[in-house]
């Protein structure tokens, strides 16, 4: 049985990308060809702008169109004590769930002043979050007064460049507190080239929560509990997936968030004895080696943190030894890692079930 230690690796800190490159598609792309089970994976160093040449006419790229909220606030209690608030999820026009850092947890009814601009009232506790009641439309106040919540491994304060580059060019539905980072590499030129090649596009929405950065703290992976995120698949997406299958094309998830939404919906549909359909739901799906993929054939993804659930996901998809070889190559070749880093193109290995604790 695989354990947390199986997903550890040493990463030189200078390979953690601190800023985005000047051009989105100037990032590097490691194409991983692992389709021959009797041979080591073939690793091809490319530029991301070459992605259209790596996919086929009739394939379908599925993007996550979530938009990152300016979800971080600094503020104070009525006593003057300093607080930090990170919005986790907008739950209504004037309500949201949030993490609150303070010297003492604020009880219900507490008034907090955020960004020296407006007051919110603390409502009920929904572990591990607090309900916040806003005086007006939360999305408007968040966009106007909040700060972009860059990942904890990015060391600079967010600036104007981040406000553009930590969003995808197709972001449309506000609600995430972290970017679907595989999508950050796509610019208009790449999207136009994909269209010219006859590659289809579709979107879904999964609002990425702050839990995406939470470390796994248990050695036995079966004991880990994933955070929950909301997602939505539309009729148009489901129809495009069916049409892609009918013509022999491949479904390519852009990012692990797209992957998780597609696979969660397909797993739940199968459990209910029905075909994949449009849905709006919550998922805490935890994909580890042994998981049987139902929808996704290929995956565009960034390089992930050691011991992270996302590293486990890509290992389940492509095979743990394939991922180890690819990461060793990426480190030796000085690829850039994490949110502002470079990308990989992976192909599903149906024999990648090298452990069985991932479940069906």
UniProtKB/Swiss-Prot annotation:
Transmembrane intervals: none
Catalytic activity: 7-aminomethyl-7-carbaguanosine(34) in tRNA + S-adenosyl-L-methionine = epoxyqueuosine(34) in tRNA + adenine + L-methionine + 2 H(+)
Swiss-Prot/TrEMBL keywords: Cytoplasm, Queuosine biosynthesis, S-adenosyl-L-methionine, Transferase
Enzyme class at the top of the EC tree: transferase
GO CC entries: cytoplasm
Tagged with keyword Disulfide bond: no
Pathway given in the UniProt record: tRNA modification; tRNA-queuosine biosynthesis
GO BP annotations listed: queuosine biosynthetic process; tRNA wobble guanine modification
EC numbers: 2.4.99.17
Signal peptide boundaries: none
Pfam family for this entry, one: Queuosine_synth
Location in the cell: Cytoplasm
GO MF annotation, one: S-adenosylmethionine:tRNA ribosyltransferase-isomerase activity
SUPFAM superfamilies: QueA-like (SSF111337)
UniProt record similarity statement: Belongs to the QueA family.
Record function comment: Transfers and isomerizes the ribose moiety from AdoMet to the 7-aminomethyl group of 7-deazaguanine (preQ1-tRNA) to give epoxyqueuosine (oQ-tRNA).
Subunit structure: Monomer.
Protein name: S-adenosylmethionine:tRNA ribosyltransferase-isomerase
Organism in which the protein naturally occurs: Burkholderia pseudomallei (strain K96243)
């Amino acid at each position: 049985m695989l354990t947390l230690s199986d997903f550890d690796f040493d990463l030189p800190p200078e390979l953690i990308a601190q800023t985005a490159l000047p051009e989105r598609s100037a990032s590097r792309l490691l194409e991983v060809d692992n389709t021959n089970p009797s041979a080591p994976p073939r690793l091809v160093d490319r530029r991301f702008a070459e992605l259209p040449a790596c996919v086929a006419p009739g394939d379908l790229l599925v993007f996550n169109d979530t938009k990152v909220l300016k979800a971080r606030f600094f503020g104070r209690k009525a006593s003057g004590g300093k607080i930090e608030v990170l919005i986790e999820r907008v739950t209504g026009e004037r309500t949201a769930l949030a993490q609150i850092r303070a010297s003492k947890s604020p009880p219900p009814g507490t008034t907090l002043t955020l960004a020296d601009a407006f007051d919110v009232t603390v409502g009920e506790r929904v572990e591990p979050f607090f309900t916040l009641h806003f005086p007006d439309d939360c999305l408007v106040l968040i966009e106007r007064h909040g700060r972009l919540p860059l990942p904890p491994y990015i060391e600079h304060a967010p600036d104007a460049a981040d406000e553009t580059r930590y969003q995808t060019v197709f972001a449309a539905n506000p609600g995430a507190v972290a970017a679907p980072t595989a999508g950050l590499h796509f610019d208009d030129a790449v999207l136009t080239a994909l269209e010219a090649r006859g590659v289809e596009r579709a979107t879904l929405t999964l609002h990425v929560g702050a839990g995406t950065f939470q470390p796994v703290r248990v050695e036995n992976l079966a004991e880990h509990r994933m955070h929950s995120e909301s997602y939505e698949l539309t009729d148009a997406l489901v129809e495009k997936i069916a049409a892609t299958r009918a013509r022999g094309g491949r479904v390519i998830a852009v990012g692990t968030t797209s992957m998780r939404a597609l696979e969660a919906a397909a797993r739940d549909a199968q459990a209910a004895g029905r075909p994949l359909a449009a849905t709006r739901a919550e998922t805490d799906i935890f994909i580890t080696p042994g998981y049987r993929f139902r929808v996704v054939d290929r995956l565009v993804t960034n390089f992930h943190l050691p011991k992270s659930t996302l590293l486990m996901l890509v290992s389940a998809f492509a095979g743990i030894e394939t991922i180890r070889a690819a990461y060793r190559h990426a480190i030796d070749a000085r690829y850039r890692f994490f949110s502002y880093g470079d990308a990989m193109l992976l192909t599903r290995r149906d024999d990648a079930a090298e452990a069985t604790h991932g479940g069906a």
